[in-house]
Design a protein with these regions (language model features):
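Aromatic "clamp/platform" in nucleotide-sugar-dependent glycosyltransferases that forms part
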Residues: 288
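Conserved acidic donor-binding segment of nucleotide-sugar-dependent glycosyltransferases
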Residues: 320-332, 340-346
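A conserved mid-protein helix/loop that constitutes part of the nucleotide-sugar donor-binding site
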Residues: 19, 204-227, 237, 244-250
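Short alpha-helical donor nucleotide-sugar binding micro-motif in glycosyltransferases
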Residues: 80, 145-146, 267-268, 275-280
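N-terminal subdomain of nucleotide-sugar transferases
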Residues: 1-56, 369-372, 376
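Donor nucleotide-sugar binding/catalytic pocket of nucleotide-sugar-dependent glycosyltransferases
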Residues: 39, 53-56, 132-135, 139-188
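Short hydrophobic beta-strand element within catalytic cores of glycosyltransferases
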Residues: 296, 305-308
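Nucleotide-activated donor-binding/catalytic signature segment of Leloir-type glycosyltransferases, i.e.
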Residues: 250-268
């Protein structure tokens, strides 16, 4: 099968969308399928693979990290026609997504789209209009786009329900992104990373991995750590990742009494992120806007007991009472759930063992097999 992937987000930007695309692409190629990616050009970045086609792009004030594609390049569109694609799979419902839709209809082939993001929760990034007005416009846009597709893929059932509430009537398939990152425990990496950051070998480390953005609810994480650090004097917090909210997070942390026990790594290459999981003892995830929360799956693979806010798609990746505890989105409950795992070490150890077992559910190969079933269903529908 020849598959065309269209996305605003792609290498070199590191986020859940890019990781999902690369994971799927790798597995499909292993199975003998041809996969071609179409994405915006990123200044200063050169692709190492011939199957990636770049469109001209511009940077915008609303999303400085994500160049906006200008999906008009006649020669490139002619090249798409010559590829004789069997299906188009869009990953974003914006410029590249609409281009993929137009090309699919022109070529008479099916189009599938994956919804990776709760876009309406990002309305605050567009300050020129009231947030509720922006949310309404975004929801209408999503409904129009997805109802023109032959199938929609989401990583968790809460997101499927959300799209149905928006009025999406296209068949929706739930397929979590597979975890291709080897986060299995590495004692040498654990020791080295702790030494690099001046953390004692016998300290306990609360870990967060992900973008530092306002919608990640990081104020809750920092306030919870501040409370817990007074009770547990061996507790440190690792914040692994970068993003537009990083400076503000650092400023908040600098005002904490235990600020010297908060470590910000900034952006970290994905291969090194795997090692940071080994340095942790517990994974704390405050985000309420995740469609899946792939980092939660990665944390399970590292054997980390998890505490997550019971919202969005993250809870579906966990088995509460086996590998994790779910908390309400308030400081008292979130702090209490983390404190329970810090205090009851036997419970934390049981969760750690089950976490590794449960992580096996998120197989990249299984993800690709299920996606191929969706492609087939889309072919019949189109």
């Amino acid at each position: 099968m020849k598959i065309g992937i269209f996305s605003e987000s792609y290498d070199p930007v590191l986020n859940g969308v890019t990781v999902s695309i690369l994971t799927l692409t790798k597995e499909l190629k292993k199975m003998g399928h041809e996969v071609y990616a179409f994405a915006p050009r990123y200044p200063g970045y050169t692709d190492t693979e011939n199957e990636v086609f770049r469109f001209p792009s511009v940077r915008t004030w609303a999303a400085r990290d994500y160049p906006l594609a200008i999906p008009y390049l006649p020669k490139l569109i002619q090249r798409v026609n010559r590829l004789e694609l069997d299906i188009i799979h869009t990953q974003t419902p914006f410029m590249m997504g609409w281009l993929g839709l137009r090309l699919a209809r022109r070529l008479g082939i099916p189009i599938i789209s994956t919804n990776h993001t709760q876009y309406a929760e990002y309305a605050h990034y567009f300050p020129l209009a009231p947030v509720e007005m922006t949310r309404t416009l975004i929801i209408g846009h999503l409904r129009r786009y997805y109802n023109r597709c032959d199938g929609v893929v989401v990583p968790s059932s809460p997101i499927a329900e959300l799209l149905r509430d928006y009025g999406v009537r296209t068949p929706i398939h739930v397929i979590p992104t597979g975890n291709a990152l080897d986060t299995s425990r590495d004692e040498e990496a654990r020791s080295r990373i702790r030494q690099e950051h001046g953390i004692p070998a016998d300290a306990r480390v609360m870990l967060y991995v992900g973008r530092l953005a306002r919608e990640k609810n990081l104020g809750l994480l920092l306030e919870a750590f501040d409370r817990l650090a007074h009770k547990h004097d061996d507790l440190y917090l690792f914040v692994v990742g970068g993003g537009p909210f990083e400076a503000e997070c650092r400023e908040i942390a600098s005002g904490l009494e235990c600020c010297k026990r908060v470590v910000f790594t900034g952006s970290v290459p994905r291969e090194k992120v795997a090692k940071y999981y080994s340095a942790g003892d517990l994974f704390a995830f405050p985000s309420v806007t995740e469609t899946q929360g792939l980092v939660v799956c990665e944390a399970l693979g590292a054997g980390l007991p998890c505490v997550a806010v019971n919202a969005g798609g993250s809870p579906e990746m966990l088995v509460e009472g086996e590998d994790s505890l779910l908390a309400e989105n308030d400081i008292e409950d979130f702090t209490a759930k983390i404190d329970l795992l810090l205090t009851d070490r036997e419970l934390a150890q049981r969760f750690s063992i089950k976490a590794v077992e449960n992580a096996a559910r998120f197989s990249p190969h299984g993800m690709a097999l299920r996606m191929l079933e969706v492609y087939t269903a889309g072919s019949h529908r189109s």
